[in-house]
Amino acid sequence: QGLREGERSLQCSEMQSRAHEIITGTVTAVDAERGNIVLDLGKGGSAVLPKNEQVPGEHFTEGQMVQVYVVDVLATERGPRVTISRTHPGLVKRMFELEVPEIYDGTVEIKAIAREAGARTKMAVWSKNPDVDPVGACIGAHGSRVEKIVEELGGEKIDIIRWSEDINEFISAALSPAKVVKVELLPGETKSCRVTVPDHQLSLAIGNKGQNVRLCAHLTGYNIDTVSYTHLRAHETPEHL
């Protein structure tokens, strides 16, 4: 029994050292009814990848190798309880840390990340070295770095944005691909702003089912009301324009 406890303790320590890392597991069972899958993580460890932690549209078969993000590891009497995910923003963040040398060595920093798994991720980056373009470093020559990650994520779109401590600049960049005319921070305790965009870019700014503006809000921490330039002119007095 003491030997088994020692093994469990060692197993827990090993898995805890892999928290917030990407690991590859092998599918050993698929629950067709619930959609959950069981992964063998090696060294006697296993974990369940629940349906709600899988990217929409993904399908798995026994024997398949799957990359997952280790969200948490809890030591229990029966061994480590490992929480894994493929939808967590940390998966994308860690992929960039491993793929981009400038992030790995600390020159470029990921300041914020927002993700709707399987559809789109927005990531804000900043460089400690003014000679290093943080966005270019993440994209890579001819898009090589970002394309590799997009491929691993099954075609998920990734917007890489230059982070700024100027919140107006940051919000404007985060709303890309739409071009912003004006950012107005609104008074009050909640972080809110009104963003004006050209009329023909309003639907682009809001995005499919509100996705673009929703990710922008998660990334910046601001509630965002997006309006068209015509709407602004119709509702504001001349001194506000």
Regions found by a protein language model. Give the residues of each.
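RNA-contacting regions in translation and RNA-metabolism proteins
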Residues: 1-233, 241
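Extended, polar beta-sheet/loop recognition surfaces of beta-rich domains
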Residues: 238
